[in-house]
Amino acid sequence: MREYFKHTSSLLFGVIISIPLAIYYEISMLLANRGMEAEVRNAADVLFKRIFEGIGYDGPLAGVVMFALLFVIAAIAQGAHKEKTGIKIHWHYYPVLIAESALYAMLLFALMAISMNAMTPTLALSPIDIGYSLGAGVYEELLFRALLLSGLLFIAGKLPGKTTVWKIVAVLISALLFAGAHYIGAAGDTFSWMSFLTRSLGGLLLGFVFMFRGLGAAVYTHAIYDIYTIFL
């Protein structure tokens, strides 16, 4: 069990198991946006795509280049610490991690439902709905946890005082920014303190999942939670 937790929390494992979700998301968005003047996409995805468009890669190619770059970075990082995790990918851990993430997602769903006092489910779950949920899991976790929270945790480790306290502050900051991002732009939600606090609570849980269980668990927890909110 110790080997399972150590292996599945690695960045390389997280990047690799996020790729199938990203592929499904890209295909579903291509189908959903056929013939539309304004594309519907996850905001975090749009942000990443614009960055890569600036260096000459656009559309799905930008996603391919981004994940190739992530894979190289993760492989180098894991190779430098191979005495801890090893380079080999143990695929039999994949379904176990999905089941583990589903449990975290159910906990998140329960907490969010209690906070919101009620949930409004959508009874019809389409392949495109699933794709959008998977994309949110991948791109929002890459932005707010893999990049933002990792950066904040790095800074927290350099600050004077108790590192644990600073790490909790880092998770809180990333959670607040994650919640606030849902109200930005034309497609953003209407702000209310209840929804903001609820999303902040969700960001806290996802932050701790990322910190203790790695990118893969955070991505799948987020994606499965989004599917729960549509289906349950």
Which residue stretches match the model-derived regions?
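Alpha-helical transmembrane segments and their helix-start/interface "positive-inside/aromatic belt" motifs
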Residues: 2-19, 89-102
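Alpha-helical transmembrane segments of multi-pass membrane proteins
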Residues: 18-40, 112-117
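Hydrophobic core of alpha-helical transmembrane segments in multi-pass integral membrane proteins
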Residues: 19-26, 64-79, 105-111, 176-177
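Juxtamembrane "helix-exit" motif on the non-cytosolic side of transmembrane helices
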Residues: 30, 113-122, 181-187
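Membrane-interface interhelical loops and short amphipathic "cap" helices
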Residues: 37-55, 118-131, 190-194
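Interfacial helix-start motif at the membrane-water boundary
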Residues: 48-70
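Juxtamembrane helix-loop-helix connectors linking adjacent transmembrane helices
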Residues: 78-137, 153-161
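Transmembrane helix-loop-helix hairpins at the membrane interface
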Residues: 126-232
